[in-house]
């Protein structure tokens, strides 16, 4: 391909980064004569195609002008060559690409460029043609800062093309299809491209609106030609569009690359996260309404970016606004708009979304009267209980498929009879009460606007029994208990951590890593799971922490030794009595660990910590039971003698790590305000650094261990 550049060759080609979002439009004017003495060749219309982008135009010459293209140049209206104009002429492909800046003049809301073609076959090259070609100025007629961007709605994406006066003529606006035979829509790209008439397009997911010199195209996410990129629960939709019109030998093309993410954001106590799957594009900038923020500046503006397995943007909640809503208590968090600009296929493409955090539970029914004597919660739900009203057909209990026991659609009423031991009902003990809790959720009868993500209503139902309740003293006749199996099966142990010393509800496996700060105790419990024998007892041997999942990895921090508290840096491990709140107290061991125990010398906190314990199971009826007893008399204590072998000792580990942060962390207050369970974002943010740190620490520990072993061998 032969190329010719005009103007300052050091000037950057701004058209290379222009957006496909622009209107592609052809606007011909009559030709004029270059200078005195040059033969006039007057043409009423430029016979090629002009494509208008946001920052540049592309001129495609017809084959009949192929002999003249070698001597084509960009000139001003007087015929003088524009020396500052940097354009690229490609004689092989018969194209000319020129940026608006320095190559056009601004005339009544459009960019006007003049090109001159000289016939090299003419004597002394005295015959010339001049064409004035125009492109509309994108967004020039309105204050809309999102002009040239895809607008993402709940079920579709849209893009608006601008006209300049005179283009949206009556033939375009008429509904008569015969008047629009010159228009067609090309969807997709390359071999997958399909050409559709307007009527065909409107039956395949497209809609067209023309008003006030603008054309808006709405595209369903399932429309013909739309490509979907998926990763986990995130989805991105893309489709290249070309709106073509041919009339009187002139060609008009409106082209755009639409891009949209339609999934709701996820919110926690500190951040709002937007997930975008991998696709052929790279993030260029973010705009929250006050100007573009380059990727290199995101951290300074409270935005964190992850690029592993797609793209994740974490927005600090200080960037969000609050909205008082009838459906959200006390308020709803949202961003008024979020514009993301990507580099894709040598162009800049943008999309605008409107992120909102889903509402928290708006209604909580708490009454001891809900609990029945036969072990159920009876709950009535009315459609008018909220504004907007509920769609009672969508009511569900927890994560189960439990259905209402009574429906009265005319009265807008349903009734649930929720079993205390089914339908996902949870329970916990508090003082002398046992508390049962479940959740009913439904969709609104009148869904929110297309932009809103707030489509679900949640209601908590809770009841409790106290020691004075008659249910506790009721005698229930039942069949005789089956005889115990001779082989009880393998014994199962678990090591769990709790939010506080009440030991009511442990952290779930999906909540790891659990975030803790210096001076915060870590409440741990070792427990036997599948035994009901009151005569067996769980006895701790040693407990320790490591920086990896392997219990044998180095370095190690001891927290319990020989069943006794381990004093390290004046922060002693503390044991907690189990009490009578559990059925078999001897099947539990509870203690807490101070996070200062993991600060080593001048080093900082070992941020990811894994806990492990070795235990014995002793039979209190056995003559050797005294061998499993624990006697702690301070530093002079000796190791406990046991009658068991190492094979009978069992090791149990936490299901996940503890993430330790320093006191100065800016996330501490936000995490504490929501409880210790808000761990996901903070943990993920430091995970990459932790993997590297853990590897270094483990390697150094192994080298130290091998060095000591070698010295011992030499001494022997």
Swiss-Prot record:
Signal peptide limits: 1-35
Keywords of this entry: Cell membrane, Cleavage on pair of basic residues, Disulfide bond, Extracellular matrix, Fertilization, Glycoprotein, Membrane, Receptor, Secreted, Signal, Transmembrane, Transmembrane helix
Main location: membrane
KW Transmembrane (keyword) present: yes
KW Membrane (keyword) present: yes
TM spans (from-to): 687-706
Tissues and organs where the protein is expressed, per its UniProt entry: Expressed in oocytes.
GO biological process, one term: prevention of polyspermy
Subcellular location: Cell membrane
Residues covered by the ZP domain: 370-635
Site entry: Cleavage: 168-169, 638-639
MF annotations from Gene Ontology: acrosin binding; structural constituent of egg coat
Gene3D superfamilies in UniProt: Zona pellucida, ZP-C domain (2.60.40.4100), Zona pellucida, ZP-N domain (2.60.40.3210)
Record-annotated disulphide pairs: 52-135, 85-103, 371-463, 402-423, 543-613, 564-632, 618-628
Residues bearing glycans: 93, 316, 323, 460, 530
Residue ranges of the region described as Disordered: 467-489
Pro-peptide region(s): 639-716
A Gene Ontology cellular-component term: egg coat
Record topology, Cytoplasmic segments: 707-716
Membrane topology: Single-pass type I membrane protein
Ranges in the topological domain labelled Extracellular: 36-686
Free-text description of this protein's post-translational modifications in UniProt: Proteolytically cleaved before the transmembrane segment to yield the secreted ectodomain incorporated in the zona pellucida.
Family per similarity comment: Belongs to the ZP domain family. ZPA subfamily.
Role of this protein: Component of the zona pellucida, an extracellular matrix surrounding oocytes which mediates sperm binding, induction of the acrosome reaction and prevents post-fertilization polyspermy. The zona pellucida is composed of 3 to 4 glycoproteins, ZP1, ZP2, ZP3, and ZP4. ZP2 may act as a secondary sperm receptor.
Record's protein name: Zona pellucida sperm-binding protein 2
Source organism of the structure: Sus scrofa (Pig)
